[in-house]
């Protein structure tokens, strides 16, 4: 019998660039700091068992579940749906549907993962579409929850408001913020700026009586990392561009500093003196330290890891998944949605 602190995670061992070699090592690392974790590991039995043999401490916490098929990184979602039933990704998500696991984790194909998760778990009552959500680092101590990061290229006013409610609950669960500050991403902070849907969503959020979050208005993209907001809501097109720009800028600055500090003997000496500070800088910008995105709006928890995440990165995603399970995320979102839609002015927003 599982204790209330245990979290049973269905893991797609075949997803990501490193496959079982990286995934199994990550499970061992996560278990070393959280002994209440339990895993159902889906994948090629021989490959998974070979890696498990390297970490005997995993044996009591893991169940190997053979999966004859693998969804590749280039596979179209339509084809992935047809092969989902026997794939490691599909079987992991199915375990959440049947109650064999509390959540699913995969580093595989994002489009396929979303399509299979929507098919198996369905949308929550009151939600039209899922939103790909993650926590980005900021100058503030908590970071910022940002959604949608690419699941929906076009979003109307209703989608944005639904994302706001879900994002606020996620910030409460993942970051422990009782009443997060929430903003809508826009090209300016003035009320007349932005699309009609953005302005309509802003107007509704301003007038809504609720306690889940405090709406603080529009925010521009240059303020994402400043810690001005705890939750930033946008459509998936703008969100994905913003995310890729942030990641690319971080790599650019890191490479620029590396080039600058290797340009001369004096600069190399300067780097040696500054090494502790730059080590902190690298840790802060390393995406492995912030790994893990979730499709909010589904009747279950499905977490997506970066495909190129290393062992510590996937372990970070495991810890995030466990935290969301223990915080009862799905039920908390459902409760807040019911409260939000119970207001007469918001009933037309319900899916």
From Swiss-Prot:
GO terms for cellular component: cytoplasm. It holds the Pfam family FA_synthesis. The keyword Transferase applies. Its EC number is 2.3.1.274. GO terms for biological process: fatty acid biosynthetic process; phospholipid biosynthetic process. It catalyses: a fatty acyl-[ACP] + phosphate = an acyl phosphate + holo-[ACP]. Coiled coil: none annotated. The keyword Transferase applies. This is Phosphate acyltransferase. It comes from Zymomonas mobilis subsp. mobilis (strain ATCC 31821 / ZM4 / CP4).
């Amino acid at each position: 019998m599982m204790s209330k602190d245990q979290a049973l995670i269905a893991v797609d061992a075949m997803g990501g660039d490193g496959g079982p070699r990286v995934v199994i090592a990550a499970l061992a690392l996560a278990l070393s700091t959280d002994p209440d974790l339990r895993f159902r590991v889906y994948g090629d039995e021989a490959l998974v068992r070979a890696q498990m043999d390297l970490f005997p401490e995993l044996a009591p916490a893991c169940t190997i579940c053979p999966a004859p098929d693998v969804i590749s990184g280039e596979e179209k979602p339509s084809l992935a749906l047809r092969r989902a039933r026997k794939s490691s990704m599909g079987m992991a998500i199915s375990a959440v549907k049947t109650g064999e696991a509390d959540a699913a984790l995969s580093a595989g194909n994002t489009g396929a993962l979303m399509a299979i998760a929507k098919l198996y778990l369905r949308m929550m009552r009151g939600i039209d579409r899922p939103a790909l959500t993650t926590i980005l680092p900021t100058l503030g101590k908590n970071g910022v929850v940002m959604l949608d990061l690419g699941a929906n290229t076009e979003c109307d006013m209703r989608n944005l408001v639904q994302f706001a409610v879900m994002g606020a609950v996620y910030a409460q669960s993942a970051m422990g913020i009782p009443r997060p500050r929430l903003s809508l991403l826009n090209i300016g902070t003035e009320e007349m700026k932005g699309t009609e849907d953005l302005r309509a969503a802003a107007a509704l959020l301003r007038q809504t009586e609720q306690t889940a979050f405090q709406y603080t208005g529009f925010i521009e993209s240059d303020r994402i990392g400043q810690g001005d907001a705890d939750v930033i809501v946008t459509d998936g097109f703008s969100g994905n561009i913003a995310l890729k720009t942030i990641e690319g800028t971080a790599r650019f600055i890191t490479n620029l500093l590396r080039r600058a500090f290797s340009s001369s003997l004096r600069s190399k000496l300067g780097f040696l003196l500054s090494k502790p500070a730059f080590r902190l800088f690298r840790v802060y910008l390393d995406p492995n330290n912030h790994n893990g995105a979730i499709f909010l709006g589904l009747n279950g928890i499905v977490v997506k890891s970066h495909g190129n995440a290393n062992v510590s990165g996937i372990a970070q995603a495991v810890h995030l998944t466990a935290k969301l399970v223990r915080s009862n995320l799905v039920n908390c979102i459902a409760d807040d949605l019911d409260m939000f839609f119970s207001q007469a002015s918001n009933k037309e927003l319900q899916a």
